[in-house]
């Protein structure tokens, strides 16, 4: 897959999809970019070493798409980032738990609750139709642990 696989997937592919889709999107359309709190806050809050490369690549994708907001606004296309905490039942959480036993329980304790896949999917769907927050970011799950450190 190559050393730069995460960056190609989480930044370059996202930009390529936007480039291909934008001419087809009409005013009132919306781009929803899904990321993790660990990636969204990676510049100010360290994450597990096992996830750092992925987190940095996802943040690079977020930044690349955010840089396009003026262009999207000009054609009436909305943009929102959905930043979610660790999601129980995903392969990412399962793999992180394998290399860092206790990671899920630790994050659940810090956050008070972790969303499952269905709950998180419902939040992503809401982001596609709800008003766009002023900062273009919808947080799903607790962020206190990230903003206190940031």
Which residues fall in each region the model found?
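Short, flexible, mixed-charge acidic loops at enzyme active sites
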Residues: 1, 93-102
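Catalytic loop of short-chain dehydrogenase/reductase
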Residues: 1-7, 23, 27-74, 86-90
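Short secondary-structure boundary micro-motifs
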Residues: 6-7, 39, 96, 112-114
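Aromatic/hydrophobic pocket-lining residues that form the small-molecule binding cavity
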Residues: 14
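A short, exposed helix-loop element centered on a Lys and neighboring polar residues
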Residues: 18-19
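C-terminal helical subdomain
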Residues: 75-82, 98-150
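Short active-site-adjacent structural elements
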Residues: 89-92, 147-148
């Amino acid at each position: 897959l190559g050393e730069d696989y995460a960056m190609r997937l989480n930044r370059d592919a996202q930009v390529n999809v936007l480039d291909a889709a934008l001419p087809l999107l009409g005013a009132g359309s919306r781009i929803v970019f899904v990321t993790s709190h660990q990636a969204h806050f990676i510049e100010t809050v360290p994450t597990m070493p096992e996830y750092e490369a992925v987190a940095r690549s996802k943040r690079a994708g977020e930044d690349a798409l955010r840089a396009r907001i003026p262009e999207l606004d000009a054609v009436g296309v909305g943009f929102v980032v959905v930043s979610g905490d660790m999601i129980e039942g995903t392969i990412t959480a399962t793999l992180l738990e394998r290399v860092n036993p206790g990671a899920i329980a630790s994050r659940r304790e810090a956050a008070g609750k972790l969303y499952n896949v269905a709950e998180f999917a419902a939040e992503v769907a809401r982001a596609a139709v709800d008003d766009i927050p002023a900062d273009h970011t919808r947080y799903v799950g607790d962020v206190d642990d990230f903003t206190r450190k940031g």
